């Protein structure tokens, strides 16, 4: 058994200081039945806990660290910027540089506004959609998580799903009444909702790949159908690419699937490990945002030079060749996990989109949240604990996906497959 004495002690202390001992619920490791690991250091594809244990990391800070930990170019640039000042409350040139990169690479974005988190991005995009259309209702998908804004904490995924919560107390009934929810990948339900409420639906918000119920890609025609129905009814289509943005492809999920939304929300990768979000889209829509237009949004630290620098240095290193390597490595890991499960007769279904991978312990084809919930959660928890013993750090939730980075080597992937083989052999025995 791995020695985790220091992590156990740190968590005991933390529970007296913070709700549940953490600053984001999934970090408490509740659903996998073990004490959370307290991390001390990361380098490349590895992380090290405060007890000195080394792990191959597939959490990558929940996706942002697409070049792995302590990327030299990012770190050196941050040092240089920090010496000049961390924030000014005034524009800086690095904001222009990052905005230009985003606009060049994201098909839907003509103008972009930087914010501080993915939640800020989605909340701001919803306000913009409502203000632009003059409508009140939004349509989202069951099990899709778009941050913790009130309108979006209705049948959400991610940490909400991990804790088994359908919704969150504290969301006013009046707010919830303006959120329509339907099953992901169910285009007929979307069409029915528009037939009933189409004149008052401001937008449809969707993850191009549902990354917060595990990893659930869109079925053929689903995203295209959303584009068609929103255009038919004059509603906006918002892609929440906080997770998929620059993760699944060079041009994000919209480039990967060839569907262009009206607005796009970004986060994670564009911050390079620092707190960043963004939303952008067609110029005629984005010009409605203050100070160009009447729809208000602001932020004290929005566009701060540290975050902009980390984002710029992260994106500038991402080339089309990087994504070819992601595909090769992710396919290698996917096939290895599948073969290990098949060898031991373990029910499983594996989904992948680019460098995002989700393994479900079920025989069902996982195309929506109901199917994701058929996964054997007890088996997942046991599998998770065994993988920790083997030195592999996975997201501590069935409803989160694995992420690869440019720092992961073939040897890392081979070691991970070998660890899964050992874990599954033990659990099947």
Curated annotation (Swiss-Prot):
Residue numbers of N6-(pyridoxal phosphate)lysine PTMs: 268
Cysteines joined through disulfide linkages: none
Keyword annotations from UniProtKB, A to Z: Cytoplasm, Isomerase, Porphyrin biosynthesis, Pyridoxal phosphate
Keyword check for Cytoplasm: yes
First-listed, main subcellular location of the protein, grouped into a coarse class: cytoplasm
GO MF annotation terms: glutamate-1-semialdehyde 2,1-aminomutase activity; pyridoxal phosphate binding; transaminase activity
BP GO terms, sorted: protoporphyrinogen IX biosynthetic process
This enzyme's EC code(s): 5.4.3.8
One Gene Ontology cellular component: cytoplasm
Oligomer status and interactors: Homodimer.
Protein name: Glutamate-1-semialdehyde 2,1-aminomutase 2
Family: Belongs to the class-III pyridoxal-phosphate-dependent aminotransferase family. HemL subfamily.
Cell compartments where the protein resides: Cytoplasm
EC top class named in words: isomerase
Catalytic activity: (S)-4-amino-5-oxopentanoate = 5-aminolevulinate
Pathway recorded for this protein: Porphyrin-containing compound metabolism; protoporphyrin-IX biosynthesis; 5-aminolevulinate from L-glutamyl-tRNA(Glu): step 2/2
Cofactor(s) the protein needs: pyridoxal 5'-phosphate
InterPro entries: 4pyrrol_synth_GluAld_NH2Trfase, Aminotrans_3, Aminotrans_3_PPA_site, PyrdxlP-dep_Trfase, PyrdxlP-dep_Trfase_major, PyrdxlP-dep_Trfase_small
């Amino acid at each position: 058994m791995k020695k985790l004495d220091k992590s156990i002690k740190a968590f005991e202390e933390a529970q007296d200081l913070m709700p549940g001992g953490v600053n984001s619920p999934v970090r408490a490791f509740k659903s996998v039945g073990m004490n959370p690991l307290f991390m001390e250091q990361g380098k490349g594809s590895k992380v090290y806990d405060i007890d000195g244990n080394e792990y191959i990391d597939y959490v990558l800070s929940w996706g942002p660290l697409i070049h792995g930990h302590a990327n030299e170019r990012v770190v050196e640039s941050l040092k240089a910027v920090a010496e000049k000042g961390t924030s000014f409350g005034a524009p800086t040139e690095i904001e222009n540089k990052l905005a230009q990169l985003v606009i060049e690479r994201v098909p839907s974005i003509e103008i972009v506004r930087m914010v501080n988190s993915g939640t800020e991005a989605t909340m701001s995009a919803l306000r913009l959609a409502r203000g632009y259309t003059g409508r009140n209702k939004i349509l989202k998908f069951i099990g899709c998580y778009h941050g913790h804004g009130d309108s979006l904490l209705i049948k959400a995924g991610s940490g909400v799903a991990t804790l088994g919560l359908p919704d969150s107390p504290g969301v006013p009934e009046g707010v919830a009444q303006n959120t329509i929810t339907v099953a992901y990948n169910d285009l007929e339900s979307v069409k029915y909702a528009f037939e009933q409420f189409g004149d008052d639906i401001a937008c449809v918000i969707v993850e191009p790949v549902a990354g917060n119920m595990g990893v659930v890609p869109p079925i053929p025609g689903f995203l295209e159908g959303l584009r068609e129905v929103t255009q038919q009814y004059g509603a906006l289509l918002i892609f929440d690419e906080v997770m998929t943005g620059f993760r699944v492809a060079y041009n994000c999920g919209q480039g990967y699937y060839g569907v262009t939304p009206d607005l796009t929300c970004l986060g994670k990768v564009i911050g390079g490990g620092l707190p960043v979000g963004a939303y952008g889209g067609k110029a005629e829509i984005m010009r409605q945002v203050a100070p160009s237009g009447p729809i208000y949004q602001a932020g004290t630290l929005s566009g701060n030079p540290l975050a902009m620098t980390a984002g710029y240095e992260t994106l500038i290193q991402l080339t089309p060749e990087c994504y070819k390597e992601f595909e090769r490595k992710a396919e290698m890991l996917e096939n290895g996990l599948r073969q290990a499960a098949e060898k031991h007769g373990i029910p499983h279904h594996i989904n992948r989109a680019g460098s995002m991978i989700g393994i479900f312990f079920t025989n069902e084809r996982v195309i929506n949240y109901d199917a994701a919930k058929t996964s054997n959660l007890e088996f997942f928890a046991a599998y998770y604990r065994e993988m920790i013993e083997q030195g592999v750090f996975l997201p501590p939730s069935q409803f989160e996906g694995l992420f690869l980075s440019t720092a992961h080597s073939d040897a890392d992937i081979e070691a991970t497959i070998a660890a899964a083989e050992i874990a599954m052999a033990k659990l099947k025995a």
